[in-house]
């Protein structure tokens, strides 16, 4: 439509206005700017603007679309005629005629099919590397027996005898010295302008049947939970002559027993013994791409975080990969014998003096200092580990 002004602003309302508030404000403004009463320049355009705002905000479905998507949600979903159809303009003349000209209109055009949503659950690995999935989608499809017309084969729909094929019923009233014309959707043909005398036995005259279709979905590498994949034309069938709706596949990535995800980085945790942390060692770490050797320096404190470069998840747009961040957790010895305790405390005493049990000096202090410098790096993934 022509106006791009906020509909609530046009009617002087807040966004939490009730249906009664909307109707009351519209009638007040419509009486003020109706062209039959107000001959000032711009009055007719103003009347059209407030009528458009009322037509949208008085319809719960259109209002919800507007509240969520603004004018884009209305212009992309409804034709100009659809915006006004069904609104209660009684007492203010033929709004359709004022906007679109002429004293008669044709029936409403065929409507596209409804969009559908399918929730697809995939594994952590499938999201990381991409996958092809076959899904079964229940939807309405065009009836093959009547080719979507709704009429028994060999027959065809007839012009509606009630509205003469216009899809609308016009009612004229006289009051206040003026003639008012209101228009409503024909209840016989429901605005289509045609009636089916001999319905198709397969679809009962609807032109559509319920069916389940197998569809292949290509999930790209790097996909994440909440991502929506649009499959054009795979929604419900539309009216005859209108396109089908679209299918939106919403992805849900299942939790992994080892890995977590932060953006494109993979987070994991591995346990090490006190001896491994104190003396240093090489350990094998699980990644999405197999096991990788990782060095644990001598004197590594618990909760230290190490980075394994490019072992994370591939970016959706490009060939870059994230990293894997590995937090090591030192397992505390339990149920030690008396001799084991004595040896353990001897090791602690050696480490506290800047030595490790192997006799090399200074490595404990060096790695303690390195760990302190790495705290900012650890904070980046702290929430992921603690969640």
UniProtKB/Swiss-Prot annotation:
UniProt keyword annotation of Membrane present: no
Protein name as catalogued: Chaperone protein DnaJ
UniProt keyword Nucleotide-binding, yes or no: no
Cellular localisation: Cytoplasm
Zinc finger (CR-type): 130-212
Classification via Pfam families: DnaJ, DnaJ_C, DnaJ_CXXCXGXG
Cofactor (UniProt): Zn(2+)
Cofactor binding: number and manner: Binds 2 Zn(2+) ions per monomer.
GO BP, sorted A to Z: chaperone cofactor-dependent protein refolding; DNA replication; protein refolding; response to heat
Residues the record lists as binding Zn(2+) 2: 160, 163, 186, 189
Organism placement in taxonomy: Archaea, Methanobacteriati, Methanobacteriota, Stenosarchaea group, Methanomicrobia
Residue segments, region Disordered: 143-162
Coiled-coil regions, chain positions: none
Domain J residue range list: 6-70
Subunit composition and interactions: Homodimer.
Family membership noted in the UniProt record: Belongs to the DnaJ family.
HAMAP family in alphabetical order: DnaJ (MF_01152)
Keywords for this protein: Chaperone, Cytoplasm, DNA replication, Metal-binding, Repeat, Stress response, Zinc, Zinc-finger
Listed GO CC annotations: cytoplasm
């Amino acid at each position: 439509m022509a106006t791009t002004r906020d509909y609530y602003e046009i009617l002087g309302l807040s966004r939490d206005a009730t249906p009664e508030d909307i109707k009351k404000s519209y009638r007040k403004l419509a009486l003020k700017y109706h062209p039959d009463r107000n001959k000032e320049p711009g009055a007719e355009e103003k009347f059209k603007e407030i009528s458009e705002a009322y037509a949208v905000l008085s319809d719960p479905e259109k209002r919800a679309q507007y509240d969520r998507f603004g004018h884009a949600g209305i212009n992309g979903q409804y034709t100009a005629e659809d915006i006004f159809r069904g609104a209660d303009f009684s007492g203010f003349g033929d709004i359709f005629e004022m906007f679109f000209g002429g004293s008669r209109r044709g029936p409403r055009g065929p409507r596209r099919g409804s969009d559908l949503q399918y929730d697809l659950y995939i594994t952590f690995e499938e999201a990381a590397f991409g996958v092809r999935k076959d899904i079964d989608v229940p939807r309405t499809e065009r009836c093959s027996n009547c080719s979507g017309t709704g009429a028994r084969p060999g027959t065809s729909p007839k012009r509606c005898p009630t509205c003469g094929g216009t899809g609308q019923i016009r009612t004229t009233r006289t009051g206040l010295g003026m003639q008012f014309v209101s228009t409503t959707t024909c209840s016989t043909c429901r605005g289509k302008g045609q009636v089916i005398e001999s319905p198709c036995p397969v679809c009962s005259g609807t032109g559509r049947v319920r069916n389940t279709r197998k569809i292949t979905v290509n999930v790209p590498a790097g996909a994440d939970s909440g991502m929506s994949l649009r499959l054009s034309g795979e929604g419900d069938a539309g009216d005859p002559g209108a396109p089908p709706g679209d299918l939106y596949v919403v992805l849900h990535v299942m939790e992994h027993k080892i890995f977590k995800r932060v953006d494109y980085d993979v987070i994991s945790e591995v346990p090490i013994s006190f001896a491994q942390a104190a003396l240093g060692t090489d350990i094998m770490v699980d990644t999405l791409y197999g096991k990788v050797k990782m060095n644990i320096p001598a004197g590594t404190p618990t909760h230290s975080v190490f980075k394994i470069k490019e072992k994370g998840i591939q970016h959706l747009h490009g060939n870059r990969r994230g990293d894997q961040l590995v937090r090591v957790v030192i397992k505390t010895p339990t149920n030690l014998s008396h001799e084991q305790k004595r040896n353990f405390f001897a090791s602690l005493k050696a480490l506290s003096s800047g030595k490790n049990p192997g006799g090399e000096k200074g490595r404990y202090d060096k790695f303690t200092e390195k760990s302190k410098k790495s705290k900012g790096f650890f904070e980046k993934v702290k929430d992921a580990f603690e969640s």
